[in-house]
Amino acid sequence: MKPLNIIFAGTPDFAARHLQALINSHHNVIAVYTQPDRPAGRGKKLTASPVKELAVSHDIPVYQPGSLRKEPAQQELAALNADIMVVVAYGLILPKVVLDTPRLGCINVHGSILPRWRGAAPIQRALWAGDKETGVTIMQMDVGLDTGDMLLKTYLPIEDDDTSATLYEKLALQGPDALLQALEGLANGTLTAEKQDEVLANYAEKLSKEEARLDWRKSATQLWQEVRAFNPWPVSYFEHQGNTIKVWQTQVSTTSSNAAPGTIISASKKGIEVATGDGVLTLLSMQLPGKKPLSVADILNARGDWFTPNTRLNNEAQ
């Protein structure tokens, strides 16, 4: 297969994994587009994206326009004369003129099995909804939000102990292989584009800190899914004794209870069992204010008086 001249557009670590795969391949990455440097850390020092750092280390030209809607930026991109543009978590909208500029257009790596979970948080929403599988879709981009024709899909079962952190890692390994496979198919003309079924489409909205507040009136299963979805950010939490307590790991208990939602049923080193709107949730790992995440056994050693049976966990803001 003849090497393709590729423009890569991406910003976070997830994107950098894909850029590394392209650098390691026989293709030519002729330019990298990434978000402008942003203030980060306590000192608010201007910080380059992981994609920029990788590109600079390999002497690949880097472009950081604040927008691609203006003609000078579009002309600059067109002058690169790329065969294709690969977009992974870039963060800027590509207008139609940009999508149509490369010979083979622009393709995107998306962390879900489209058309399910279009949008910003597909990994988290798959867990939140209790999906049994996820995957990666390589898509020919159009002007819609993740609405383009699908070129290739890979599938990944979601395990009971998966969190957004673990799924992110798994998809960051799966995505680059899928991307290289799709590029080969595009170059050889062997890929058949598949339209997305709009009836099956749904939208993966961004997560919010407010959404991570545990509502004990929900079912134990739904809360278990949310805790996994919101790990590592924004992290599920509840209010108790005037403190915000983060919850990192739970499981659905086989215990049954008619107690009011939020009531502690039992507390031992094996876990703190809490009544919910349907079923009982066992808290396994939590984080007290200013402390590191700890097992429930360690939490009870430090603050066992907060978690005695029949105590009602208060989830109202103090």
UniProtKB/Swiss-Prot annotation:
The keyword Zinc does not apply. Keywords: Protein biosynthesis, Transferase. Disulfide bonds: none annotated. (6S)-5,6,7,8-tetrahydrofolate binds at residues 112-115. GO terms for molecular function: methionyl-tRNA formyltransferase activity. SUPFAM superfamilies: FMT C-terminal domain-like, Formyltransferase. GO terms for cellular component: cytosol. InterPro entries: Fmt, Formyl_trans_C, Formyl_trans_C_sf, Formyl_transf_N, Formyl_transf_N_sf, Formyl_transferase-like_C_sf, GART_AS, Met-tRNA-FMT_C. Its EC number is 2.1.2.9. It catalyses: L-methionyl-tRNA(fMet) + (6R)-10-formyltetrahydrofolate = N-formyl-L-methionyl-tRNA(fMet) + (6S)-5,6,7,8-tetrahydrofolate + H(+). Belongs to the Fmt family. Attaches a formyl group to the free amino group of methionyl-tRNA(fMet). The formyl group appears to play a dual role in the initiator identity of N-formylmethionyl-tRNA by promoting its recognition by IF2 and preventing the misappropriation of this tRNA by the elongation apparatus. HAMAP family: Formyl_trans (MF_00182). This is Methionyl-tRNA formyltransferase.
